[in-house]
Amino acid sequence: SIHGVAYDADLYTFKAFSSSGAGSDATTGGAFGLIEAIAAIDIVNNSWGTDADCSSASECRTVIGSTTYDNWEDMSQLSTPKISVFAAGNDSESEPTAECQTMAYNTDISAVSVCVVAVSHSSLGTDGGLLADFSNQCGKVAAYCIAAPGDRIYSHTHLGSYTYRSGTSMAAPMVSGGLALIMQEFSSLTPAQVVSRLLTTANDTSEYSQTAKYGHGLMNLNAATTAIAELQTINGSNLLDDPNTSYNDLVKNSFTSSAAFSNALNNALAGQTMEVYDSFDR
């Protein structure tokens, strides 16, 4: 038996392309318009893209289509923005799709968007989790890009069966599922903070330190769903959201006492609750 990355998630599917894979600005933009109006949708996975370059916000808008661009921007500007995940493309190029490149020129979009390249574990690329031969690289959107498994992923088909598929279109939903898990684990995070946590905790060592290829590195959900950096307690009457709030670092503090005092302290603290925060205030 198999299950997805975020198997408790509710899925909404939108048909924006024909059976041959053809789409238009009207169909993709129209889908984004529908998604914008559905409050229950938190993350939008896009396993599609435009094989073209753009070097400004206005040029990107022209390349990907004004309706698609405007509705994507609108989704990113909602009071609770929707996170957009885009496949980087499968053309073995040094730059990703135009949709990914758009993230470099629109701060509202880039705050809640992720571009995804694919790593490989088969003959389609170098074994050992390196960038798949078919995958585009992060290029100029390295700041908004991450790598995830996308080679020979066992998944369902539209015919109701299961098969192996490869491509950044398989890597993107891995990241969408990862973002859903972070949202589930840390429900108080904003969408932008969820994206930041995913990118910050990626494995960026050794091979994955090549930002032009891998952006922030290889997605690491174990790190993303556990404490980041220091564990701290908030001091006395401070407010969590106050920029002047002070904390006590738990790692750098210790407490030694006699057995009698220790027992008394344990009894006094029984049933009490202590809040502990990591470096993301979570």
Model-derived features with residue positions:
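A short beta-to-alpha transition loop/helix N-cap that caps and shapes the active-site region
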Residues: 20-22, 123-126, 205-208
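Structural recognition of the beta-strand scaffold that forms the well-ordered cores
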Residues: 4, 10-15, 42-48, 83-87, ...
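Sec-exported extracytoplasmic/periplasmic mature domains
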Residues: 7, 36, 49, 76-80, ...
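Extracytoplasmic/secreted envelope proteins and their assembly/folding machinery
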Residues: 29-32, 69-73, 113, 131, ...
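Extracellular S/T/G-rich loop segment that most often corresponds to the catalytic His/Ser-adjacent loop
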Residues: 102-184, 188
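C-terminal subdomain of the subtilisin-like protease fold in secreted/lumenal serine endopeptidases
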Residues: 41-46, 112-115, 184-281
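Substrate-binding/access-modulating region of protease and related hydrolase catalytic domains
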Residues: 14-110, 158-166, 170-172
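Subtilisin-like serine protease catalytic core
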Residues: 1-27, 39, 55, 79, ...
